[in-house]
UniProtKB/Swiss-Prot annotation:
The lineage of its organism: Eukaryota, Fungi, Fungi incertae sedis, Microsporidia, Unikaryonidae. Coiled coil: none annotated. Belongs to the UPF0329 family. Disulfide bonds: none annotated. Residues 306-339, 353-362 have a biased composition (Basic and acidic residues). Residues 306-404 are annotated as: Disordered. It holds the Pfam family DUF3654. InterPro entries: DUF3654, UPF0329. This is UPF0329 protein ECU01_0110/ECU01_1500/ECU08_0040.
Length: 592
């Protein structure tokens, strides 16, 4: 089995068949004999996603990642599906099988791609619908006549039989036996080309997965989708096999290798929500070999508990609304009684009754709150529980470089220091630019989370690199910054180097970078970090211990119970009811 379209998708699925060593750009992944390939309708170009399941061609053309030659993806999609799901039979020093494929399948697959692409480009179909269409037309499971795949399989079997009968005489008996065994394995696999029911299940499973992917895209917020794609399981696998440089300049479709029948049974037994969660877990890197009946039941229980939690939250909110309504009615009733009685006596009695009513409401709230069973309160970094106790254990120590801490000062002082400093990047910036940048750089509260024991649940390590004579490390987290009426999705970037005397990491770069789903891959790549980093870090001890930093009045930190996200809130010191800014850092997706 070998790969013919290496410039676009690099993945080859290898089971019992040969993989040509001459295909230098191909990448092989071992596939369990019981597993099949599932293709997710997410197309990537290097680190960046260029096609979502919900994307129509008109959306694709407007995309910032629009390829100059989209036909290469669209018009080769059927070949991509064939190579990933079926594969090629090929033998070294024997081109009969290659010629047979070119004769019977190449033109057929090309026509499938062209027709599907025309419908996609001219019509109102989404990318996932186009992928489903390609599956249906390749495998022709509902065809009343002879299927092209079956005819090709019959011709292949004849060629394999011929090859077995004409083994080279110079081969030893041991070599012949080995070759005969391999050819029989190949023949057994090719015989499945006639098994319409097998391919019908594969098409059904693909449609099920495509639908789950659409629901994921429609149901998640932009920052949640960014968190999902940031993990990039297939990208990580490609980088491990190809290296960072080659993988970042290739195109590929996200896929997984899993027991198709198990997935279909899980969908029938547990429904679409569990299927969607299974797809999420595969996108996060869950291996198909680890997805069995026991694991599916575990996922189903997690989904049920999540639903119960949601129902409890809805019930709680309804009770709170009812209490508020009763409270309002009670106050209105008390006011009516006051008017009916004499002013002096009425005031005394009315106020007394109102207070008694409020007291009863308060007691009811406390009892119901204590009875509620919810998600345990999670303490992150400098956030505090209602008891007011500080976080204990597992906290890390960081130092802060002056180029980070200076953003806490007034815009005038920041400008003055940058103008007098050595970094050309910031010299001569206008006061207005400094004010704008302060919004994105004055986020030192992030260090409360970074030095907590939960930091790895939020931050991803994008790797180390050396620049300007110093080894540096970069971490990123997905977040949302709300300021001035705007809601901006992006990443929180943290750059560190080690203090040579103490070995303590020094934070020399800290900012929120606005980016969307399409540009997130670039932002998270080590190449981007190195290219946009300062050339040389001033290491003349221009930094202080993070623990010495005093947070200004009106800045609070908390973990949002419902989502597990970490929030930094900047309130107006003069009016704490007014929120000036809010930075929410997303927890990394949960791997079950």
């Amino acid at each position: 089995m070998w790969w013919r379209h290496a410039p676009w998708v690099l993945i080859v699925v290898v089971d019992v068949m040969y993989c040509s060593s001459e295909e230098e750009n191909a990448v092989s992944f071992e596939l369990d004999p019981d597993n099949e390939t599932i293709i997710f309708p997410f197309a990537f170009g290097g680190d960046n996603i260029i096609m979502l399941p919900t994307m129509k061609y008109s959306d694709y053309k407007r995309s910032t990642r629009y390829m100059k030659d989209p036909e290469f993806l669209l018009y080769s999609l059927s070949s991509v599906v064939w190579d990933l799901v079926v594969g090629h039979v090929s033998y070294k020093n024997d081109d009969r099988f290659d010629k047979l494929f070119d004769k019977m399948m190449s033109k057929y697959l090309n026509n499938v791609s062209i027709n599907a692409s025309r419908i996609y480009i001219r019509g109102n179909k989404t990318f996932s619908e186009m992928l489903e269409m390609v599956y249906e037309r390749i495998f022709e499971c509902d065809s009343k006549g002879s299927r092209q795949m079956a005819r090709y399989g019959e011709s292949l079997i004849r060629e394999i039989d011929s090859k077995m009968e004409s083994m080279p005489s110079e081969m030893s008996e041991e070599e012949k036996e080995k070759m005969r065994s391999d050819l029989n394995d190949d023949k057994k696999y090719v015989e499945s080309f006639r098994d319409t029911e097998k391919w019908r299940q594969i098409v059904e499973a693909e449609k099920m997965v495509c639908n789950a992917c659409k629901e994921i895209c429609l149901g998640l917020k932009e920052e949640e989708l960014m968190g999902l794609f940031a993990e990039g399981s297939m990208r990580k696998a490609l980088k491990a096999k190809l290296g960072e440089e080659k993988a970042s300049h290739r195109g590929y479709l996200e896929c997984a290798f899993v027991d198709i029948k198990l997935l279909l049974d899980a969908h029938k037994e547990h429904g679409g929500d569990v299927t969607k969660e299974l797809v999420m877990q595969m996108l996060l890197g869950k291996k198909g070999k680890n997805i069995d009946k026991r694991y599916i039941n575990k996922v189903a229980n997690v989904v049920k508990e999540r639903q119960r939690r949601r129902e409890r939250e809805i019930e709680k909110n309804m009770k709170e609304l009812m209490r508020d309504e009763e409270k309002a009615k009670s106050k209105e009733k008390a006011k009516s009684k006051e008017k009916a009685k004499s002013k002096k006596k009425g005031e005394s009695v009315g106020v007394s009754e109102a207070k008694e009513e409020e007291k009863k409401e308060s007691e009811t709230e406390e009892v119901e709150a204590s009875e509620e069973v919810g998600i345990p309160s999670v303490e992150v970094g400098g956030a505090r529980r209602k008891t007011g106790k500080k976080s204990e254990g597992g906290r890390k120590r960081y130092k802060i470089h002056r180029r980070v801490s200076r953003w806490r000062k007034s815009p005038e002082k920041i400008k003055d220091e940058w103008d007098k400093g050595s970094e050309e990047k910031w010299k001569g910036r206008s006061l207005e630019e400094i004010k704008e940048q302060k919004v994105f750089h004055d986020i030192m509260g992030v260090l409360e989370l970074l030095r907590s024991e939960d930091a790895d649940k939020f931050f991803m390590d994008t790797g180390k690199y050396t620049k300007g004579g110093s080894e540096r490390q970069r971490m990123v987290a997905i977040g949302v910054l709300e300021s001035g009426g705007k809601r901006m999705a992006g990443v929180v970037e943290v750059g560190t180097f080690k203090d040579s005397s103490s070995g303590c990491p020094v934070v020399y770069h800290l900012m929120f970078r606005v980016t969307g789903i399409e540009g997130m891959g670039d932002v998270m790549s080590p190449e981007f970090a190195e290219a946009n980093d300062i050339e040389k870090i001033d290491k003349n001890r221009e930094y202080q211990d993070e623990g010495m930093f005093v947070y200004p009045k009106g800045v609070t930190f908390e973990t949002v119970k419902e989502t597990g996200s970490f929030q930094i809130v900047w309130e107006n010191p003069s009016d704490t009811s007014e929120v000036l800014r809010r930075l929410t850092i997303q927890r990394r997706p949960c791997v079950i």
